[in-house]
Amino acid sequence: MRIGTRWLSYDIHGKLRIKSNVVVVNQYFLSSEAREVPDLVIYVGDFDHDRIQELFDEKLSVVYRRGGVLRSKVLLAGLTGRTILLASTPSYRLLRKPGKRLRALIKAVIQIKLIQRGLTYVHSACVCRDSSAAMIVAPPETGKTLTALMLTRSGYKFLSDDMSLVGLGRVVYSNPSPLTIHPIHVETCGLKLGLAKRVEMSLRHKLRSIPYVLLTVDEFRMSAFEVVGERDIAERARVDAIFFLEEGKEYVGELDPEEALKRLKAVGKMHRYLFENEFLQTYAYYNPALDIDSLAAREGKIYEELVEGTRLFVVRSEKRKFWRLVDSVFRRS
């Protein structure tokens, strides 16, 4: 590690403290309390692999091309306790940012640390009134973001847009990551964008409609603080209703808990990296103290509690106008 490295400290609701020299979670969790010993240290850059490796008993290390511009090395240690992840990759050396595979590994390690502390991510949006939360579940491009934003403009508080952070007891914690914004969000929600942002959004939206080009152009994103406002972001609430969105003729119906659990597990784990990560599976092979099945069971318990204690609904609507139905049902339930 280099002397003078600029470190970022994160505190995820007092459950997980991270120290990293690269951005690993959204800015909402940035903390100035650097005195606390971190649960997870992440360092991306050059390091003395052999020297550091000697310090740990429980570890997994991979080294490719020890010399040259394309050299790559990773060391992961202490995954069942205080954890350190060190990585040096060509993408960071050349572009100063982690590549796709390394980003996936970082996210997977963070997910393990959260599950160990009784939390997990669910691919969903969440809003709340007082301490009662509505979880909005749907595949991508169905209307979760639009529904959450419109409900926020109707007096609800915002908790999350794409990935909800949920714990035991159906507690959902704020996770206001940057929002993907499309023209429909601007038009329907009345979002006020400056000229530069409006042009950028329109250009990105058009480019991503072209086959193959979309693979090279990122979606237009805005901070949740810009879109929603800090005062309208709640810290936590309890999930009391889950709404499964579907496109179709307007309809609201209750859902059986068994079917709801299957749906929640199917769509709720989208954009997840944990149990399919080959590096972590190999780590578990060499370090049996990391019990993957036990982690999956802990996560499963959180999912089961969500459907056992809440009201469950299928909501269908055309043109993504789900928010009126969700609002009406949630106020009654």
Predicted features along the sequence, with ranges:
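A noncatalytic interaction/capping subdomain that flanks phosphate/NTP-handling catalytic cores
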Residues: M1-P140, R153-S154, L165-S333
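Conserved glycine(s) of the Walker
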Residues: T142-K144
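A conserved segment at the C-terminal end of the G1
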Residues: L146-K157
